Structures are given as structure tokens and as C-alpha cells.
Amino acid sequence: MSQAVEFQILTATGWEDYALLDSGNGLRLEQYGRYRLIRPAAQAMWRPALREEEWQSADAVFQPSGGESGGQWQVRKSSLPDVWQMGYRHLRFQVSIGTSRHVGVFVEQSAQWDWISETVQSASQPLQVLNLFAYTGIATLAASYAGAKVTHVDASKK
């Protein structure tokens, strides 16, 4: 006889600088701070809910060229800077469009950043954190801001 396993589903809440505006036809329309971006989303096989005008207002569109990371950004509006700031709760960080579909923040990870902050703050003694494969470093920011001493390691050349 098998036993039931309990688990908690973490959801990404608390964003003011990010919103998933719409998705469909293999794409997603997202708001990153003041800027709207269109990125591929192969799982979004339905029709978009918003009108075409909303999609046309995007500042940039990522055009994939095959493979997971191949492609380039088509900038539609010259007002889109190379780098801009965003925030999540008390954390501030920079994002940018570059040579991949990613912008330097994985918004779905915000539930983990909250967990990290809460765990560090509620610890009975100061914590030391080793963040391997740290990539953009927002988990490092969360741990450090909460009071941990953090070693940040990533092999990315960015």
C-alpha cells in the first residue's frame, strides 16, 4: 500500500515590475519594467486573448533561429535601452536583451527567493550560503540582503 505524499506548491507572487500579459501561437507577451517583450513559448498552442494591437506595442521580439538558444532580438522601439533596472520586493537588479531569449531574470524563481529570505532571516545563527550555478545572481541577492554570507559561483561567461 502506498502512502500519500504531501507537498506545497509555491507560486510566484509579489511582482510589481513583471507581468505575463498574454500568450498564444507559440509566444508570450511579457512586461519587464517599462518594456514589453515577445518571447517564444512552444507550449502556448492556443490563440492569444489580447488584440493584435497589444502585441504590436512590444518593444522587442525574439526571433529564434533553431536550437534552444539560437536567434536574435528584433528591437521595434529605439527607446529600449541595452540594460534597464527592475525590482522584486526589496531587491534591485539589471536586465537586458542579448544573444539569447533570456533577459537575465527567471521570474518563476521568485518563490524560491522568498523562501531563501525567510529561511535566512529566521535562522538562529548567521548562515553561510554557497550558491552554485548561480547565473544571474538574484538568489544570491536574496540571501545576502537577508543577512547571509554568500559565495556566488557560476561558469557563465556573461
Residue ranges and their predicted role:
Residues 32-33, 132:
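Single, functionally critical "micro-switch" positions that shape active/binding sites
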Residues 118-158:
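Conserved SAM/SAH cofactor-binding pocket of Class I
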Residues 2-20:
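Short, Gly/Pro- and small/polar-rich lid/capping loops
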Residues 1-5, 52-55:
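Short, compositionally biased leader-like segments
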Residues 11, 88, 158:
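Short, motif-level signal for alpha-helix interfacial/capping segments enriched in acidic residues
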Residues 7-9, 24, 80, 130:
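Generic hydrophobic-segment detector
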Residues 109, 113, 137-140:
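Hydrophobic alpha-helical segments
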Residues 14-30, 37-107, 114-117:
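Non-catalytic substrate-recognition/targeting regions of SAM-dependent transferases
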